[in-house]
């Protein structure tokens, strides 16, 4: 009898995991079909590594989880830039880094507003705020290019762009 109960519980757990995995894969596939800028592999990999995304049962909950992930990436990147500002190797690009830090603060505000939009089912508002946040990594990199300087955070900005693109693409599917 205990074996049967254990088997039923295991199969329910496995089914729940499979459902979340299917939601992630299907959502990433549909989003990629609509927006080729989105990397299908990056989408699936980043969402399957996130516990909130893995627990999502609807596209809306996946949008919330992926937006929170993007906000966490910005917070992490702000920490990296704060460390770079203290590093003597980057003293010739302090102003550029400060400008990027300001951009990240704006993006953080945009994502906070987008989360509120999503929770209230204002997907158009969420789209506007996610789009504004999506511009930030490029704006930061553009500043370095215009100044003919090398950005020490190009890779991080690329990852941030891809990360923000996920909830934006999903919001367009709601």
UniProtKB/Swiss-Prot annotation:
Any one of the GO CC terms: apoplast
Residues bearing attached sugar chains per UniProt: 129
Any GO BP annotation: plant-type cell wall organization or biogenesis
CDD domains assigned to the protein according to its UniProt record, in alphabetical order: PMEI-Pla_a_1_like
Entries under InterPro entries matching the protein: Invertase/methylesterase_inhib, Pectinesterase_inhib_dom, Pla_a_1-like
One Pfam family cited in the UniProt record for this chain: PMEI
Induction, as annotated: Induced in leaves during infection by Botrytis cinerea.
Compartments where located: Secreted, Extracellular space, Apoplast
Keyword 4Fe-4S included in the entry's annotation: no
Disulfide bonds: 28-43, 100-140
Top-rank lineage group of the source organism: Eukaryota
Function: Pectin methylesterase (PME) inhibitor involved in the maintenance of cell wall integrity in response to necrotrophic pathogens. Modulates PME activity and pectin methylesterification during infection by Botrytis cinerea and contributes to resistance against the pathogen.
UniProt family annotation: Belongs to the PMEI family.
Identification of the protein by name: Pectinesterase inhibitor 12
Gene: PMEI12
